Amino acid sequence: MMAAFFFAFFVALVLSDGTTGTTASVMTMEARIYDDADLSQFYQLLETSQVANNTLTYRHVTVFAPTNRAFQKYNGSKSNLVLYHMSNLPLTIERLGLSVSSELDGNPPLWVTRKPGPTGEEEVFINNAKILKQHSNFQSKIKVNGDTKTQVLHVIDEVLEPVRSISPESPIYNPDAFQFINQSENFNMGNHRVRTFRQRIVIEKKEGIFTADGRYTFFIPVDEGFKPEPRPQKVDHLVIDGHVIPNHILFTVPTPENVYYETLVFSDNLKVTVSFLMEHNKVYVKSNTIVGDASHHTGVVLAEIVKPNIPVRNGVIHLIQRPLMVIDSTVKDFLESFKGIEKEDGPVYKFYETIRDFGDDIMTTINRLHDVTLFAPSNAALEEPGVQHILQDKRRVKEILNLHYVKQRLPLEKIQNKSISQAQAGIPTAADRKKLYFNVVQGPAGNQTITVEGGGVNATVVTANIAATNGIIHIIDRVLGVPYTTVLDKLRTDPMLNSTYFLGQRRGFNEQLNDTTKRFTYFAPREQAWSGANISYPSTIKKLFMQDFSYHTKQILERHLVVADQVYTMAKLREMSINESVTLTSARDTLKLRVKELSESYQIEWEGKWIRVFRHDVECTNGIIHVIDGVFLKDSDVRVTGDASLASFAPHLIIFLIAKWLL
């Protein structure tokens, strides 16, 4: 009833002859909001605010109106909330600057962020709320005592939440970051307290960086994150600087992931950057000490943002779970930090859960090691159906878990080093005779992607260099050792097998390798194997790569492929050929091999030649690949391939001669 009265009264003003001192265009701001059913909750706030009504009646204004869906997600106070969504300047999207003063007491700023959208169009945010452009830039004009007042409406997808003082005796309006920290008990922060960090700021005399005018992003650790006890003393003046990003106001939604921002501690002697990470609807912040010193070690520290997007006069504050830059936890401590119901969507919680359920002894072993690198699969990787199936096999799970750590420190910089990423021998893991192999892929923009292969599975490092006192943790996007590709897909995507894949495309040889009803054992020559064969048989290899000789290429590849009702691991082949050769049925004829084990690798003998198995037991969903350092070529192949055109023409010639004789 009241809404109808309010609307009728306002329309009367619109249609008046000017005696009230106010006239307007056909549709006023208030009428536009009233007319939009998706803004009904915001309209209710307008109705109850006399100040907002007066602003709409007499003044220039820009209104940021949250949708009803935005209010459904909002559980904060609505007292005077509407004034924080209004500014006394009429600003279209194009005219929005870096900030806008709101009409709330103290005129706290609303911060503006512009960023490119997924399709290239510009997106604009007010604090953490996105402006819905298709519903925005509505303008109306009213006349007040002869002056024209312009009013602009923007619709946003999130309610803007101001900093509110809960002390009626001494209210605080529009605080800067230090006022917020210093008077944190007087603000609504839920159960979070920041006394310890405040104490460190005062002791280190760093108040100035939190009171300075400008545009800053502040990360404030809560008291809970300062355990165990020695941790507070490690937060010195440089660590405090590492919690502040200058010249950027970074709210969580508009800030892209994995973009590195320089902190206040960024000099020749010490360099620290900060970036954001999203995981299961939680936001994490990562400090990366790129250049360290004796007191500040290199590496990444990961902290959950427990209360984000607190706007202050000189920027934005995020309350975080623990201090950045402080490396005082073991690898085991890092994994166990995700214990508890509230941590079950932490970035590697499911991996921790798997170790807890299947590999307690592995956790004990890792904790004893002074130098360890753990490759921890993300939650999404462990949710894959193929992984869930394997989790039923306890023995297999233990073997897979052992594949995910090595007994040395491998920070990203060391992996990027050619000697590691191109190391032919691989890096031994805790799994029996299993190694990890690394590859550095250069992106078009100069960025590098690091991949790790273990048990035939290629995984990408998505979060690197999480530092611990006894090692490094890298978060990867797949579970190593759990096949998810067919033999064909593995050939297609592994750069080491490019030539073998290329040759197999001739005459449809590769097509069979996608058949999941069969079990393949493929002795696949790697790139260096073809290069070596080119030295021994230059003419033959040259012809094999020519289309005219594809018939012979297919025959030679068939010699490398065993199709059976089972796969043959190198351990199984070694067992089968302890005292004699083993004969397998290849796709072409028979394949007679002997196998011997040397240290942690294997060699196979074929036709009197010993060939090293460069990488054994690369598992696929329909078979297994043994990457070998040689090609199964015979002298007779050289003679036969001497004239491929004759071989392909011979059957036609015989038929022609028989037909002629019969006639």
Question: Residue spans of the language-model regions?
Answer:
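Mature, structured domains of secreted/extracytosolic soluble proteins
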Residues: 3-7, 13-663
